[in-house]
Design a protein with these regions (language model features):
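Aromatic, loop-rich ligand-recognition surfaces of beta-strand-rich domains
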Residues: 3-84, 115-161
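Extracellular carbohydrate recognition and processing domains
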Residues: 84-122
Length: 161
């Protein structure tokens, strides 16, 4: 289930199979996905659920970055991951590509993916953004990444024109 917009915001943090969460596919770390918040805001807090410790933790994140932008024009970073089923092929997108495309780094978080079910953290003063990019830099086993549920909190909300 590599469809973050369908699964990560359904208020269900219980892992019940790969189809009910985001799975990056194998050989895709580091990798990223982008979401549209629908409003421009300043992120202040995040809570991210991943696979529980009683289950397989190898795909749980150990480091993530959150990036933001106010618009999506010229925001693409290359190369684009190609996937066939659960196999992903490409080389990782370097940080310089994110910066050159106008993405602003909001936060970097080290996560205990092997020893906990979720991470909750405050986000220091961040730039305003509508488009948020989650970049999973590393995972417990380094092959793939899984998220079950996410919650983001922001200060202020400016609707689109």
């Amino acid at each position: 289930g590599a469809n973050p917009s369908e699964y990560l915001w359904d208020n269900n943090s219980f892992w019940s199979g790969d189809s009910n969460g985001y799975h990056s596919g194998e050989n895709s770390v580091p990798g990223h996905f982008t979401i549209d918040l629908g409003v421009t805001t300043q992120l202040t807090k995040a809570k991210i659920h991943y696979r529980p410790t009683w289950s397989f933790v190898g795909n749980n994140p150990t480091e993530i970055e959150i990036w933001g932008r106010e618009n999506i024009e010229n925001a693409e970073t290359y190369p684009i991951f190609e996937s066939l089923g659960n196999n992903v092929t490409s080389s990782p997108v370097p940080t310089s590509e994110f910066e050159n495309a106008g993405w602003q780094l909001i936060t970097i978080q080290a996560i205990n993916g092997g020893g906990s079910d979720f991470a909750e953290f405050d986000i220091p003063e961040a730039p305003m953004g509508r488009y948020i990019r989650f970049r999973f830099v590393s995972t417990v086993e380094g092959n793939a990444c899984q998220f079950i549920e996410m919650a983001l909190h922001g200060m202020g909300a400016i609707p689109p024109n």
